[in-house]
Amino acid sequence: MELVIGCDINEYYVQFSYAEEGKEPVMPDLPGVTQVETALCRREGVNQWYEGKEAVKRALAGEGALAEHLFSRMLHADTIRLSDSEYQLTDLCSLFLEHTYTAFIRKVREQLGEEITVRALVLTGRIDPGVHYGKLQEIVKNLPVEDISFQSHEESIFSYLVHQPRRLMGYETQVLDLTSEQLVTYRVEMNHKTRPVVVSIETTETDLYKKKHYASIME
């Protein structure tokens, strides 16, 4: 079976899905694998890493140093200090994605009961592929997938809409994202008076209350 893997990553978690050609995407019910907190914990004294909820659990138990908000930090900084060592954030994001992707593929294979081949992977997020391309290439370098592409949320929304029934194209569309400390609204309009049809996506951000990251032990 050939699959395309979707990987949406943000400040709080990475979320995986898959699709067969010509079929609707599937977000399987695989607790701890389909959606994983973007946190890593390095065990004290050894080069052993945990990710997601296990990372938080180990850090809370005093077994290691916690690195959280990995993806958003990586976009805006180069390094992070854990205990007495400094790490490249692209290296930590690469390690995190390698572990979580491998676990997801293994569980999907078990759930489907057959061998699968990953034909392509699409990574989406609040990113500008043109600006962040170098860092994005670094964080996927260890994934065993040849065809990897990057999309901003705006591009992802557009790609989804153009594959919907034509009758929906005449309406204004709004997508709401509430995964951070902001409510992000994507407002999509299509000008059918032009040829080709011109699509515009307006993004607005509304600040909400300061909410603590559920993986945080830093504050």
Model regions: which residues?
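A short acidic Gly-Thr/Ser loop motif
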Residues: G6-Y13, M169-V184, E189-N191
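Short acidic, glycine/serine/threonine-rich loops at helix termini
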Residues: Y133-Q137, Y160-Q164, Y186-E189
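Conserved phosphate-binding catalytic cores of ATP/NTP-utilizing and phosphoryl-transfer enzymes
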Residues: M1-E2, D147-L178
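Structural motif corresponding to the C-terminal cap of alpha-helices
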Residues: D78, F104-L112, P144, L161-R166
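Short beta-strand-loop/turn "lid" adjacent to the catalytic site in phosphate-handling enzymes
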Residues: M74-A77, S85, G113-E138
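Early-domain small/polar-rich strand-loop-helix modules and first-structured segments
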Residues: M1-T79, K141, D147-S156, H192-P196, ...
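Phosphate/pyrophosphate-binding loops at sites that engage ATP/ADP/AMP, CoA/4′-phosphopantetheine
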Residues: R43, T100-R119, E219
